[in-house]
Every structure is written in structure tokens, then in C-alpha cells.
Amino acid sequence: MADENQTPEQNDQQADANQNRFGIKRIYMKDMSFETPMGVQAFQVQWQPKVNQDLNTQVNKLDENHYEVVLKLTITVKMNDDKTAFLAEVHQAGLFEVAGLEAPQLQRLLSSACPEILFPYAREALDSLATRGGFPPLQLPPINFDALFSQAMNQAQQQAEQGQQPN
């Protein structure tokens, strides 16, 4: 009887809410690499590293409800003389099923929540690469992907507004 009192719009919203789906189908390593350009010399100098972290995400739509999200994380560790001690790169990927979301919600999910799910796997893989390469463990801090997404959206909006203003 409650359904009889709802407007058609409310019924549509309730139906949409019942159809929203999110699932992790698979998490996998798409690519990884480790280089020690200095070779054994990296172990003969005092260990005072400068760590640089480069982060990027890529979203590939596979079909209507399936997306591949790839978190690309590159760590470059340099010594005091700016020589690279090691370079480690991981492309941690996930296959996600998503249905029933509007475009803004979908974009936020794929650009924020999915990379946040993938990050612990990438962090562990990078740590493992470093220690297997003979270096001390990497202790990468957590990343706030939601804040990064919001920042990127604000920046895109500002650029769009500037592009529309006459010079």
C-alpha cells in the first residue's frame, strides 16, 4: 500500500536503488618492474634516500557494467648525489562490476574508491620489490584518493571556467 502513495519518480528512485551494484571481480598485477641503476654502488654509500612517489590511475570500460581500474605507482629513490639507487614501478589492476550509478557517482567510485581498494596491494608489492632488491623496506603512507579526486575535479572546473572567459 505504501507504493500506491508514491509518485512515479519515487518509484523510479526506489527501483534504481535496488539495482545499484558494486563488486570486485578480480585484483591482479598488470605490470611491475625494478631497476638498480647504480648496481652494487648503491650499497656502498650511506643510506640517506630521497623518495619520490608518482601516482596515476587509468580506467578502461570493458562493457556496460565492467571496468578495469589500473593504479600506477612509481617510486624513485635517489641518494645524496642525486644518483638513482632504485626505481620500482607497479601497475596494480582490478576488474570491477558497477551498475546503477549516475555518471558523477560512477566517476567518483572508479577514480577514488577503486584505487583505494588497490593501493594496499600496490604498496605491499613495492615494499616486496625493495626488500628483494636488497634495500630497506618502503613504508609508504596512506593516500586519500577521495581528496585527490576532489582536487582534480576542482582544478578541471577552474580550467574550464578560465577557458570560457574572454582574454
UniProtKB/Swiss-Prot annotation:
Keywords assigned by UniProt, alphabetized: Chaperone, Cytoplasm, Protein transport, Translocation, Transport
GO biological process: protein folding; protein tetramerization; protein transport
Cystine crosslinks: none
GO molecular function: unfolded protein binding
Main subcellular location of this protein, as a coarse class: cytoplasm
InterPro entries to which the protein is assigned, alphabetical: SecB, SecB-like_sf
SUPFAM superfamilies for this protein: SecB-like (SSF54611)
Cross-referenced Pfam families: SecB (PF02556)
Subunit record text: Homotetramer, a dimer of dimers. One homotetramer interacts with 1 SecA dimer.
HAMAP family, per database record: SecB
Protein role: One of the proteins required for the normal export of preproteins out of the cell cytoplasm. It is a molecular chaperone that binds to a subset of precursor proteins, maintaining them in a translocation-competent state. It also specifically binds to its receptor SecA.
Family statement: Belongs to the SecB family.
Protein name: Protein-export protein SecB
